[in-house]
Amino acid sequence: MRVSHFFFLVTLEITATNPCTAMSHLIEYEDANDEVRAVYDDIRATRKTEYINNFWKAIANHPPTLQRTWQNVKEVMTGPGELDPLTRELIYIAVSVTNGCQYCISSHTAAGRSKGMDDAIFGELMAIVATANATNRLANGYQIPVDEQFKL
């Protein structure tokens, strides 16, 4: 490996693991344009809070992504459906753990706790996530054919 490649890889590793290194700046409400402020206002109204998460402030650097993402999250996480709000948060936490998204794990764990998740529920959820990931890897590794009665 050439020295230049080594330094590039080390830089990528440091950037990927350093929580203080942001890819873009955060857009505060007072610095936002009208399009971004409209989304922030909807987030505040929907969530019944004045707080805007850093996630939204970061993706506000591209207003179409902010708008599209908020509309999707709003519909899926707060719209009508058969799943209660805590179950939705538990699913979000499980997917975030599997994807390794520390930001999403933290924010949705906080949201889950505000909806009634306690340490026992969180522990049970982590056991399910760990078991599902382990058995998924086994099924993939062994290339197990799907049983006829399980096929969709």
Predicted regions and their residues:
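Aromatic (phenylalanine/tyrosine) cluster motif
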Residues: F6-F8
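Hydrophobic alpha-helical segments
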Residues: V10-L12, A16-L152
